[in-house]
């Protein structure tokens, strides 16, 4: 219906249609398709019509048309593509589709529009503690949802199954033989996929250590050693906005750490001393000696003060001193005009931070991959956004036996999985499961 912003497409995108394809795509085995012709069914003979989509998602074709017309004709329009649907099989396609729609309608780089995800929000300096050569030693980096598969199948695991990141040394392609896990502030039994496989894998490990400020399902079920981490009430720190934002909040220490709890950094520093003595301990945490484990306040103050003066004030033009910030409790940046993601690219012609300098509907990096085994992805990803059927969906043959699709959103009563064991909260609510009203009526519920 010609509702797209063709001028925006021509100026700022790569691969949206035939007219925005790069020259190299003509001879590319993986990068020869453009998004428009994919949608029209030019390549596979299947036009991606509202009727086609309705059969997949269960939303009527008429409603899809209404929503599409509303979004395309509303200027400006903010499409807030949240992260949850992307935490699914082939979830990156959902995120890429959101960005394609935003670019197609010219809603990137303008006030009232939205860039995909958090929208390249204005950000603060986020790192106060050291990142030195010892803090960043790593043997292998794998996809977080592949660890259980590795544990259960080692050594018969390929690098692509592990989602192994490439390296430039002798360890490239070496799948780790995982003997134990350090779960640091992360409730994997709640957050990752295929929990039954994880429960099976954790029983094979020789050591499981959990660091957290609450007893999560992971900590209660899996931990051989449970190290209590102090909360932000029990240590001196600075609060940064999630995910990005234009302010800082000073968090003074309110109470002494309860019981045997220590901060994460205290725990890791003490482990560094015990593993490698003074050489490794001082290298990991240059400002601390062994007394840091029992008295962290002075060292934390030194890190935070240096971070504020050397990074925040130096990089971001902040004139308020660390001492004044502590007195006031908050610092808010004054912006001359509303922050708009990619305003400079659209209004001033600055290149986007991509190989082409444009919004890459056709991804240069993906199109040029010839050996998917030697990538951090672990499997083939199409060069343009495409619909790929998840291996478990309502269109699966399994629905004959399992007709419902379970979705587990954040309950309004807690944050992810934490505080579920708080007795006061448990007295106010009971965790509930909801079912579609039409299904409930059909089943007499």
Annotated model-derived regions:
Residues 1-3, 43, 61, 68-75, ...:
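Structural signal for hydrophobic packing residues in well-ordered secondary-structure cores
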Residues 1-74:
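Long, well-ordered, tryptophan-enriched scaffold segments
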Residues 4-10, 78, 109-116, 280-287:
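Flexible, glycine/charged-enriched surface loops at secondary-structure junctions
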Residues 31-35, 47-52, 80-85, 247-256:
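Flexible glycine/proline-enriched surface loops and loop-helix/loop-strand junctions
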Residues 53-56, 82-90, 120-123, 186-189:
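Conserved short loop/turn motifs at secondary-structure junctions
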Residues 100-221, 231-238, 326-443:
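Extended redox/cofactor-interaction regions of prokaryotic respiratory oxidoreductases
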Residues 233-257, 267-268, 272-274:
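Glycine/threonine-rich phosphate-binding loop and adjacent beta-strand/alpha-helix elements that clamp
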Residues 255-329:
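Long, C-terminal catalytic modules of enzymes
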């Amino acid at each position: 219906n010609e509702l797209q912003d063709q001028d925006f497409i021509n100026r700022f995108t790569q691969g949206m249609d035939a007219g925005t394809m790069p020259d190299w795509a003509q001879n590319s085995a993986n990068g020869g398709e453009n998004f428009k012709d994919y949608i029209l069914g030019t390549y596979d003979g299947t036009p991606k019509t509202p009727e086609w989509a309705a059969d997949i998602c269960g939303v009527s074709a008429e409603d899809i048309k209404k929503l599409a017309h509303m979004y395309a004709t509303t200027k400006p329009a903010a499409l807030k593509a949240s992260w949850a649907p992307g935490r699914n099989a082939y979830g990156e396609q959902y995120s890429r589709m959101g960005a394609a729609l935003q670019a197609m309608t010219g809603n990137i780089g303008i006030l009232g529009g939205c860039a995909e995800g958090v929208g390249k929000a204005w950000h603060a300096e986020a790192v106060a503690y050291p990142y030195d050569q010892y803090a960043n030693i790593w043997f292998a980096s794998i996809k977080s949802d592949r660890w259980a598969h590795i544990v259960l199948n080692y050594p018969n695991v390929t690098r692509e199954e592990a989602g192994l990141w490439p390296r430039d040394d002798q360890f490239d392609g070496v799948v780790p033989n995982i003997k134990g896990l350090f779960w640091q502030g992360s409730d994997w039994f709640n957050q990752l996929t295929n929990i039954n496989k994880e429960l099976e894998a954790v029983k094979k490990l020789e050591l499981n250590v959990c660091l957290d400020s609450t007893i999560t399902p992971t900590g209660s079920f899996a931990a051989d050693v449970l190290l209590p981490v102090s909360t932000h009430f029990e240590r001196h720190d600075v609060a940064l906005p999630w995910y990005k934002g234009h302010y800082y909040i000073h968090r003074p220490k309110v109470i002494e750490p309860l019981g045997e709890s220590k901060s994460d950094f205290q725990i890791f520093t003490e482990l560094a001393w015990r593993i490698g003595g003074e050489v490794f301990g001082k290298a990991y945490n240059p400002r601390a000696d062994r007394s840091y484990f029992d008295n962290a306040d002075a060292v934390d103050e030194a890190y935070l003060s240096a971070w504020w003066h050397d990074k925040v004030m130096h990089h971001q033009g902040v004139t308020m001193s660390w001492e004044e910030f502590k007195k006031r409790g908050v610092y808010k940046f004054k912006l001359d005009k509303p922050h708009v993601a990619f305003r400079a690219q659209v209004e001033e012609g600055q290149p986007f931070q991509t190989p082409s300098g444009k919004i890459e509907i056709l991804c240069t990096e993906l199109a040029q991959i010839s050996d998917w085994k030697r990538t951090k992805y672990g499997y083939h990803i199409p060069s343009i956004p495409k619909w790929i059927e998840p291996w478990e969906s309502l269109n699966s043959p399994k629905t004959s036996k399992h007709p419902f699709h379970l979705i587990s959103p954040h309950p309004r009563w807690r944050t992810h999985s934490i505080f579920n064991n708080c007795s006061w909260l448990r007295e106010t609510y009971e965790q509930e499961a909801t079912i579609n009203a039409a299904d409930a009526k059909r089943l007499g519920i």
